[in-house]
């Protein structure tokens, strides 16, 4: 993981690249209809990312880089707009900058209303960093505010699993699935629980279900192949 950087530094650096083309200066710009502005940037960015973002040509940045810079600029102009902060947090996390993502998510979660999607990603980062007490506390607090959010229960299950509480993790996965979490993902998590419990046959059954539900999800396939090899099962061609 890359070291954390202050939020102001991260956003200022992104905006500085295009400062010469900004008119009027960002400090004098007003936040106007941020939902529409964000949508006009996110939609083409997601479309380009689905195809694969190409590199820039010479000194020119790529279109993906330009759109990301504009999303970062919007966070400076509209610093209290939670969806824009969330978009920048996701971009930072995907770019392997968890420190920047964490600071953006903390800004969102400091606002008075509930933002479960922000809590899910913040909890995931805490789990990855080994801060299980914080992750559990955050997720439990957010579940009280948004008890019908599948992602909160699923991420809470992950925190419980990593902490060795397999029974409660399974219960949380049952809730997450009932609230709409994808079955293939639930099957993968259940496979982890069965594997940790020493029930390899059950784990392989769940991993097989996860692979069938989402063949592109590599962790399920990798664990299934490893368990089959350990059991002496020849891999399928």
Where are these regions (language model features)?
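TPR/TPR-like alpha-solenoid helical repeat scaffolds
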Residues: 192-195, 218-235
